[in-house]
Amino acid sequence: MAERLSVGALRIINTSDASSFPPNPILQVLTVKELNSNPTSGAPKRYRVVLSDSINYAQSMLSTQLNHLVAENKLQKGAFVQLTQFTVNVMKERKILIVLGLNVLTELGVMDKIGNPAGLETVDALRQQQNEQNNASAPRTGISTSTNSFYGNNAAATAPAPPPMMKKPAAPNSLSTIIYPIEGLSPYQNKWTIRARVTNKSEVKHWHNQRGEGKLFSVNLLDESGEIRATGFNDQVDAFYDILQEGSVYYISRCRVNIAKKQYTNVQNEYELMFERDTEIRKAEDQTAVPVAKFSFVSLQEVGDVAKDAVIDVIGVLQNVGPVQQITSRATSRGFDKRDITIVDQTGYEMRVTLWGKTAIEFSVSEESILAFKGVKVNDFQGRSLSMLTSSTMSVDPDIQESHLLKGWYDGQGRGQEFAKHSVISSTLSTTGRSAERKNIAEVQAEHLGMSETPDYFSLKGTIVYIRKKNVSYPACPAADCNKKVFDQGGSWRCEKCNKEYDAPQYRYIITIAVGDHTGQLWLNVFDDVGKLIMHKTADELNDLQENDENAFMNCMAEACYMPYIFQCRAKQDNFKGEMRVRYTVMSINQMDWKEESKRLINFIESAQ
């Protein structure tokens, strides 16, 4: 089987530019490993794959559009793959092969590791090899000047990564002729062009604060490999806002590539673009070569198991259209137009979706049409519902498989069906009428609390043994009775719910803690009110420490550990990407009353005799 491998391909990819890349190399998979990620973020899983050509091995990242190959157990250790599209990026001073397209060669089966592949040479070895080549013959064009191999040591300087496998479209001459996939973009490249469809365009937003005033807009861009957000400020608003039209395809070049602020956008990409003075944008002649939209649908039944404030995609049949209503914000006294519509799907559930502003006023879709929503927020007011954000998109009767299947189901049996609603989920123990019985951790797990259709409530005596230090808070709206996440608009913070901008957010806790007792350990979710009691600081104060005094922040986290409390908890089923699990949330805590605990133990001993 070794003769089928593209021997030496990884070395060529590591040291050459795209013009010298071997076409569609065949490699063997040595390992497939899921990267650690925050399961509550909603981001897709990422996988690291080590590939071998029998002489060398290289670390690679799998494009999220290929995740299904891992889930279906097709991409596994020992399998053989043929790369059809890839690029090379520099990440943390290492070259990483980004796999954007591949075919699993199932006919070759699965085998033990072929040969004894080694990591590619270190920087010094590569330089020595290149010097020998230069002495033997004229220098070959396209040799990478990067000082890092796929597994190289840290170097003093980092050069841009070589470009990926490319296509040459009939693009304007002033633009680069190399078409990069969106997922291949990184800050380490400066000559690229993407061909992407505008799936969402915001309105022009204005801000005024102590540092001045300005305006901005943003667009979501989509191609076959993924999505990315692009933002323009001030002069770039005047230059590009009217050019970019929602739904159209463009060639875009010469933007700045920045690390994405993921807490402020629902676009799943490590990077984001910023339009600059030299940015070039031209409309593509072929408007059909790029997909219209990319969805990751959650069924309406599963919406009840999704965390509040999560941003998801849904699809349903429009069953009811409510009238336009005007509401007044208590915080700003400003009026807002809204409209509630109802959609249903084949899981037997209905869901209220709230439209806002211009979308609500101009909505004229006929009932029984198919509506696909991308990036709507999950609410928990008067039962589970959904709400469109300024970044959300709505497609009517989209030409996708899910739409056709849903239409067929509704015409065949769904039209006369009765649909269920998700009931109101109370956020406090006092309003549930349930007894919070004292349990130890082993009893909570053995009794499978939270696995029934309704939440279970219990009391737990335990000690905090660990606090996750990542994502302990989020920027919230400072208006009374709002608490929604706000988004950085480049000098101000915008609340979608209040439709207002603020100079600064008010941070609120979202902490994950590990609590232990004599029978085991349990992970609990903690929100703002309880977080203040545990940390003895507000989330604003802790965020300031995290940004300005790392040692003080770490000391504060350490001091909050190994403290005993009585935790009042809720256990509820949570469906995350098709996997059922139980989420435990702390509703309130109490300091230990040792006198009362002693009496409790005495009563327990006496009852056991």
Swiss-Prot record:
Residues 130-152 have a biased composition (Polar residues). InterPro entries: Euk_RPA1_DBD_C, NA-bd_OB-fold, NA-bd_OB_tRNA, Rep_factor-A_C, Rep_factor-A_N, REPA_OB_2, Rfa1. The keyword DNA-binding applies. Keywords: DNA replication, DNA-binding, Metal-binding, Nucleus, Zinc, Zinc-finger. GO terms for cellular component: chromatin; chromosome, telomeric repeat region; cytoplasm; cytosol; DNA replication factor A complex; nucleus; site of DNA damage; site of double-strand break. The keyword Metal-binding applies. Coiled coil: none annotated. One of its GO terms (molecular function) is telomeric DNA binding. Residues 130-166 are annotated as: Disordered. GO terms for biological process: DNA repair; DNA replication; double-strand break repair via homologous recombination; meiotic cell cycle; nuclear DNA replication; nucleotide-excision repair; telomere maintenance; telomere maintenance via telomerase. Its main location: nucleus. A zinc finger (C4-type) spans 477-498. SUPFAM superfamilies: Nucleic acid-binding proteins. As part of the replication protein A (RPA/RP-A), a single-stranded DNA-binding heterotrimeric complex, may play an essential role in DNA replication, recombination and repair. Binds and stabilizes single-stranded DNA intermediates, preventing complementary DNA reannealing and recruiting different proteins involved in DNA metabolism. Component of the heterotrimeric canonical replication protein A complex (RPA). Belongs to the replication factor A protein 1 family. This is Replication factor A protein 1.
